[in-house]
């Protein structure tokens, strides 16, 4: 149960932060966000904000989505011949269109649709009250709403508030905002993980950190913050020098020369033996030195962010030199990592979230249609050509990209199931 909760929290936060980036910059650009959903699947709660956006909570707590007016996935559910009802305002304009059987409007007028335009001309024409001898045309208010089949009430999407009506620079920024939010979140989480761990491990010093009570080092008199100058007359400059000698000498007395408060002391430490992957190594019970000052912690967050980015790009590069599904991971791998992280502690969960956030941001910027990177490429092509690609061609390109992503996800998920459960 702990693993499931961890997975839901991790996945949910990453996706919602990503979608909020699109949401915020769409709003700034004057693009109508028809719905901001938390979760997926059937709606369990909805609230229409004064900003024109409907905020919903859906049954499955896995991520969420943003519906921007005029985007490919935002389709009008009205078709000629459809029975529906309309609600009028005081001047006779339609302010509400009900296509749902789940919702009843007490003052609505039933009609069968003949024709409509909710983008440019803003009208709806049909037979009212079953009278097929007379066609009635109603003007539709610019801010009218439509109640969809599942009962969700959203604003109609006139052309002037659609995605394509915004400036090209605003559309590029709106597409980029999701990955950008993931990068910002990644840095914040990496920095938070450093704070939760107490600081940044410094492996380039001969100064030691925490000494485990009752361990060989503690019993020999070694103390936290001691500087180990030499072991058996071999100079120690960094933590790796220290561990190399200790691991090679299980149950053998070692002469340590340490500096403490400006004075040198000589101690005899006997590493205890420990089995690690069929090898016997020495351990003395000492952790690396940790920098705990604020600048070091902030720099640690930056360094972890840069290291993560480098690792992701190296992994992506390796796909072109030797492609293997084992180099990719989907929801199943994410669940497995969540299980391991939840057992390791809060700081490990935070670090995992940071890694996954950076992954999500970078993967979404790949120039694949249906991903944010693919949309940005289409925006750039529009800027070069001076006009957008036709909606038909863009739809085909997006469909191909979506199909590619879906096939890859199925293969990766199946491969993960085989790896972890069989």
Swiss-Prot record:
SMART domains documented for this protein: PDZ
Domain PDZ as annotated: residue spans: 179-273
Gene Ontology MF term list: metal ion binding; metalloendopeptidase activity
Keywords annotated in UniProt: Cell membrane, Hydrolase, Membrane, Metal-binding, Metalloprotease, Protease, Transmembrane, Transmembrane helix, Zinc
Xref: Pfam families: PDZ_6, Peptidase_M50
Keyword field contains Transmembrane helix: yes
Enzyme class: hydrolase
Cofactor (UniProt): Zn(2+)
Domain of life: Bacteria
Gene Ontology BP annotations: proteolysis
Localization annotation: Cell membrane
Gene3D superfamilies named in the record: 2.30.42.10
Binding site for Zn(2+): 18, 22
Residues annotated as catalytic: 19
Function: Involved in production of the peptide pheromone cAD1.
Protein name: Probable protease eep
């Amino acid at each position: 149960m702990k693993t499931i909760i961890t997975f839901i929290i991790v996945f949910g936060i990453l996706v919602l932060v990503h979608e909020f980036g699109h949401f915020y910059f769409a709003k700034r650009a004057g693009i109508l966000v028809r719905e901001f959903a938390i979760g997926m699947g059937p709606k369990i709660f909805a609230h229409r904000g004064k900003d024109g956006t409907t905020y919903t909570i859906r049954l499955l707590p896995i991520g969420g989505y943003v519906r921007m007016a005029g985007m490919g996935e935002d389709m009008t559910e009205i078709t000629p011949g459809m029975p529906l009802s309309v609600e009028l305002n005081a001047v006779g304009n339609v302010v509400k269109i009900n296509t749902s059987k789940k919702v009843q409007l007490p003052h609505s007028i039933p009609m069968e649709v003949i024709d409509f335009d909710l983008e440019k001309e803003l009208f709806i024409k049909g037979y009212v009250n079953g009278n097929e001898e007379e066609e009635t045309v109603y003007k539709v208010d610019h801010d009218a709403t439509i109640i969809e089949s599942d009962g969700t009430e959203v604003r109609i999407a006139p052309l002037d508030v659609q995605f394509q009506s915004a400036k090209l620079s605003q559309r590029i920024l709106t597409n980029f905002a999701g990955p950008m939010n993931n990068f910002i979140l990644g840095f914040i989480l990496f920095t938070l993980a450093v704070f939760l761990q107490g600081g940044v491990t410094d492996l380039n010093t001969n100064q030691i950190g925490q000494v485990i009570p009752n361990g060989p080092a503690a019993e020999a008199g070694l103390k936290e913050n001691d500087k180990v100058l030499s072991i058996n007359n071999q100079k120690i400059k960094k933590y790796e020098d220290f561990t190399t000698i200790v691991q090679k000498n299980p149950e053998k007395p070692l002469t340590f020369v340490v500096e403490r408060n400006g004075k040198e002391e000589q101690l005899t430490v006997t590493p205890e033996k420990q089995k690690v992957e069929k090898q016997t190594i020495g351990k003395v019970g000492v952790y690396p030195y940790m920098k705990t000052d604020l600048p070091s912690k902030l720099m640690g967050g930056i360094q972890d962010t840069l290291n993560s980015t480098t690792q992701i790009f190296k992994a992506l590069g390796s796909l072109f030199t030797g492609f293997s599904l084992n180099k990719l991971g989907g929801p199943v791998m994410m669940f497995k990592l969540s299980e391991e992280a939840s057992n390791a502690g809060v700081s490990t969960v935070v670090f995992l979230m940071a890694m996954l956030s950076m992954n999500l941001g970078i993967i979404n910027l790949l120039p694949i249609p249906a991903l944010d990177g693919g949309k940005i490429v289409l925006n750039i092509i529009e800027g070069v050509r001076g006009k957008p690609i036709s909606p038909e061609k863009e739809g085909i390109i997006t469909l191909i990209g979506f199909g590619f992503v879906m096939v890859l996800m199925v293969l990766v998920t199946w491969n993960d199931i085989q790896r972890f459960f069989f």
